[in-house]
């Protein structure tokens, strides 16, 4: 109970949570509108996109019932985002960079929000980082499953999870500094804002300059001899012809 009171009395923490909820809800609602869903489906998709990551975090923290279902303010904020998207959809859909910026902003805000809440519940730094990433990425994962698409964190080759992880790690360091009396509350607010700015900048720069994470190493010239000669029946490989199988 004392922990919940501490969270609810932190105006900056509450502001981050509400702003992240609205931004993330706008992105989720737009995805549902593009799929041609009805208003109820838009509301559900927006709500789960905005608060799904936080629900996962709260369940893992044991903070029950989760804020995503118990906090009327957060639920209303998510639903307002859905209504806003449904009304101004044609205009919003044309603003590619604006929506990308909103998504990046939600990513940074939720990274700070989720990690800070985990640290307030006296989780270890590693656990707080994972819970922060669950908060930042969980809603998007749920959104993409609802609209039957490969999750953005998987299909987007630009930096997406990486900025979130960086933001979570930096937030842990700030929280540890606060706990040890090294960082004051005003300094914590400034540092949290800078962390959000860094996450947003990393995300947008990676998209603008097409910076991608490397994949598997190409090994086109490597030949592995077939082991079909040791089998009673030959195995036909889809990328080899019969001469490859007979080769010793």
Protein language model regions, located:
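Ordered, amphipathic secondary-structure segments that act as subunit-interaction surfaces
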Residues: 80-117
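Structural signature of hydrophobic alpha-helical transmembrane segments
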Residues: 9-21, 66-80, 124-137
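C-terminal ends of transmembrane helices
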Residues: 25-35, 58, 83-96, 141-152, ...
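Cytoplasmic-side transmembrane-helix entry/capping segments in multi-pass membrane proteins
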Residues: 40-48, 70-76, 96-107, 131, ...
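Short, structured motif recognition centered on aromatic/hydrophobic residues
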Residues: 44-48, 55-61, 130, 134, ...
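The first (N-terminal) embedded transmembrane alpha-helix
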Residues: 14-27, 45-48, 167-170
């Amino acid at each position: 109970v004392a922990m919940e009171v501490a969270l609810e009395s932190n105006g900056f923490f509450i502001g981050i949570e509400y702003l992240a909820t609205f931004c993330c809800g706008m992105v989720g609602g737009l995805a549902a509108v593009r799929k041609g869903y009805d208003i109820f489906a838009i509301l559900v998709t927006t709500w789960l996109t905005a608060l799904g990551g936080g629900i996962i975090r709260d369940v893992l923290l044991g903070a029950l019932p989760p804020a995503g279902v118990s906090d009327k303010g957060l639920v209303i904020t998510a639903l307002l985002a859905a209504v806003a998207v449904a009304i101004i959809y044609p205009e919003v859909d044309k603003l590619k960079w604006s929506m990308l910026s909103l998504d990046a902003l939600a990513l940074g805000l939720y990274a700070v929000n989720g990690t800070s809440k985990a640290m307030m519940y006296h989780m270890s730094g590693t656990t707080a980082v994972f819970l922060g990433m669950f908060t930042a990425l969980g809603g998007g994962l749920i959104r993409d499953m609802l609209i039957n698409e490969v999750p953005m964190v998987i299909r987007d080759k630009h930096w997406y999870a990486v900025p979130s992880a960086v933001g979570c790690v930096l937030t842990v360091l700030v929280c540890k500094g606060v706990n040890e009396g090294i960082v004051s509350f005003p300094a914590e607010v400034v540092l949290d804002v800078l962390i959000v700015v860094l996450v947003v900048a990393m995300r947008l720069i990676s998209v603008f300059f097409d910076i991608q994470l490397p994949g598997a190493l190409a090994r086109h010239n490597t030949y592995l001899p077939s082991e079909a000669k040791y089998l009673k029946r030959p195995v036909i490989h889809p990328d080899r012809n019969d001469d490859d199988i007979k080769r010793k």
